[in-house]
Amino acid sequence: MLVVRADYKKYPVPVLEKMRIDEDEFYNKYDACVVVQTCNRIEAYFDTEINSNVDGILKDFQGFDVLKGKNATFHFLKVSCGMDSMILGENQILGQIKTSFQKARELKKTSRYLDSLFLKAIHVGQRARTETKINEGGVSIGSAAVELAEKNFGLANRNVLLIGAGEMGTLVAKALIEKHIKAVIVANRTYERAETLAKELKGMAVHFDKLKEAINFSDVIICATSSPHHILEKKDLIDVGNKIIIDIANPRDVDDSVRELENIELYAIDDLRHISDKNLQSRIEEIPAVEKIIDEEYEVLMKQIEKINVEEVLKEFNNYIEEIRVKELEKAIKLSKTKNPEEIMENFSKAFAKRITHDFVSYSINTSKEDLMNSAWWKNGK
């Protein structure tokens, strides 16, 4: 396996946005691959048994870090457990992996190896969260955004506007429920979704065309849409008074030029990594337990992969035998008009065995003893 990756550890969010993979182009170009993209992570997984042009892949992904083989597999299992996340143990990454895998499968872009890998990673992520406390406190990017707002500005008796009622917005909402907020407003392009989330928060929903009025009313604004373009620009916020805006959307909802406004304090995902986390130490203590699960499941995965490899060899061997059988049978049928059946069957069986022996001898001449002993295709069931 080959992984190309770029994440928050090496690049700030504005750079990651420019590095984002166009998934339509990606899946049109490659087979046996899956791309996983989040607000602070871009990763593409390749089955190199099928994508043999590794140099071509590396050329396409200059600037990305590269992992291969065992290192790539261990990395992905850690990612699924939230051990490689900005917020240790966060739950959202597991859902993002599932969604990415499902998309690749629907496009028929995975392989037997990648299917095994992703199903195993999902299982490992579930085990880690069930059997350990790596996700203690329900941590997420959404909850970190709320913690940032509370720590730096206080949320008591504040009016909060949540823009976006999708997955990320829901995570923010769950964190907001515990806070003593004066009023919560939810804005979303699909009003019904805003209304549903607002009811959970005991707040109010607004139509997107009333966004400016909602901004004027609010003290703190948390942006969490899935819009492909900016929804707030500098011109939209010049005359709205002093506001705190936390943008956790992917890609970003707020144009970076907004930082030039004196009345706006703008925070993005990069700012969340420094937020203190009261449960962090207890989650750090769970790392050895998670690593043990990863080690156990890695061994299981390797056995599954070995089985897949054997099945592939047997499939190729059966195809090879069938090809010889058909060719020799065609010869026997032609001879059946001129020779007796016993002689035909004798010649057929000898030709069949001779062809297999010839191919094996040709293979073994230039093969080391070790490689020859590890070759199973010629053993025919032994």
Swiss-Prot record:
Keywords: NADP, Oxidoreductase, Porphyrin biosynthesis. The keyword Metal-binding does not apply. The record marks H75 as: Important for activity. Gene3D superfamilies: Glutamyl tRNA-reductase dimerization domain (1.10.1200.70), Glutamyl-tRNA reductase, N-terminal domain (3.30.460.30), NAD(P)-binding Rossmann-like Domain (3.40.50.720). Its EC number is 1.2.1.70. The keyword DNA-binding does not apply. One of its GO terms (molecular function) is NADP binding. The active site is at C39 (nucleophile). Substrate binds at T38, C39, N40, R41, S85, E90, N91, Q92, Q96. GO terms for biological process: protoporphyrinogen IX biosynthetic process from glutamate. NADP(+) binds at G164, A165, G166, E167, M168, G169. It catalyses: (S)-4-amino-5-oxopentanoate + tRNA(Glu) + NADP(+) = L-glutamyl-tRNA(Glu) + NADPH + H(+). Catalyzes the NADPH-dependent reduction of glutamyl-tRNA(Glu) to glutamate 1-semialdehyde (GSA). Possesses an unusual extended V-shaped dimeric structure with each monomer consisting of three distinct domains arranged along a curved 'spinal' alpha-helix. The N-terminal catalytic domain specifically recognizes the glutamate moiety of the substrate. The second domain is the NADPH-binding domain, and the third C-terminal domain is responsible for dimerization. During catalysis, the active site Cys acts as a nucleophile attacking the alpha-carbonyl group of tRNA-bound glutamate with the formation of a thioester intermediate between enzyme and glutamate, and the concomitant release of tRNA(Glu). The thioester intermediate is finally reduced by direct hydride transfer from NADPH, to form the product GSA. Belongs to the glutamyl-tRNA reductase family. Homodimer. PANTHER family: GLUTAMYL-TRNA REDUCTASE (PTHR43013:SF1). This is Glutamyl-tRNA reductase.
